[in-house]
């Protein structure tokens, strides 16, 4: 791989923002100093006036650029998805390049409620793609199984209840085999009861993250599930999931997830799914250390001429603003997002640096820019890495999610001006990709 030297950038570290140089050798961050004079003709990135950040890790992303992780590639001409191996892999490649442009260095591709045979075929195509030797395969960190084990149609959101299945270890095993062992996150709403708790324990022991969302469960059911290993709230405050202010049954999912220090909260940060004032409220109540920003991006992201679509029995539409999706005929039911991570990061920086009236908190003070950068970087990079167990080095791999010596050089170089984060370089394990060439 050789050497890469990033010069005079503003480094967003773990606990401070400072100007310095970053030297990368064989894909690993080897030195971080105020000024590095390196012999041996390394590749040099001049980053004066730009930020050096850990790459974004999106743990909840269904697709982009016409690609859907469950159904393949959307054909605008026919209005149908092509799930053939060729179409799936071509669509995946386009989506991954769009993620690179947005500053993503790890993505967990997320599935919808769908026929099991459909998921097995798609996961098989993904497995074959990941087994080939190419830089894009480094970007994918497995699968988030969101829709398969949903239970209550009232809480379906934009998922099709026709394809909800009872929790079953055999189903998980079959999907795990089809994917080549790529399942990283599985959503098990606690209302499945003892069968769900048993599977939660099993998955936790296997190192798979167990999430809860789209859920009718009460707080006491969530408390039990959290005790068994559930530690992720699926797109918190969306889904929907039950909230209960009464004194019975320890509230609902919202209350249980806020109260537990074991649980990370996903937040879709497009400004539509969750009002910015609530985003500030959640960060203040939970602490930024347990919040993970996600896109929940759908295949429609980047499709300029798409207006309406069907996704395995569900009718959707692109809002006239082209900034979000909704279930056709139901303006209040959102259908994933068209958000890119760099835009989400810019949104969060803007919200954190503004004084804002809250709902659970009367007011939120404007943070200094450097404090906002540290918090946002944690929520987009460090926290998802910690959730997935890849923040620290070990078991033959280098950690990721922060700009530190000894970590994998999964980094971005970016310009932040006028509330817009523009990515100039994305580094995957030290290999430099200029976004203008993608």
For the regions a language model picked out, list residue spans one by one.
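Conserved, mostly hydrophobic/aromatic
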Residues: 145, 233, 348
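Metal-associated gating/positioning segment near the N- to mid-region
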Residues: 50-118
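Metal-dependent enolase-superfamily TIM-barrel catalytic cores that perform enediolate-based chemistry
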Residues: 123-146, 153-217
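Active-site core of metal-dependent hydrolases
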Residues: 176-305
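Active-site gating loops and adjacent loop-to-helix segments of metal-dependent hydrolytic enzymes
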Residues: 71-88, 97-106, 153-179, 224-264, ...
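His/Asp/Glu-enriched, well-ordered alpha-helical/loop segment
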Residues: 250-265, 284-295, 301-411
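Residue-level marker for buried hydrophobic side chains located in beta-strands
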Residues: 5, 55-57, 211-212, 293-294, ...
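Histidine-rich, glycine-flanked metal-binding segment
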Residues: 1-53
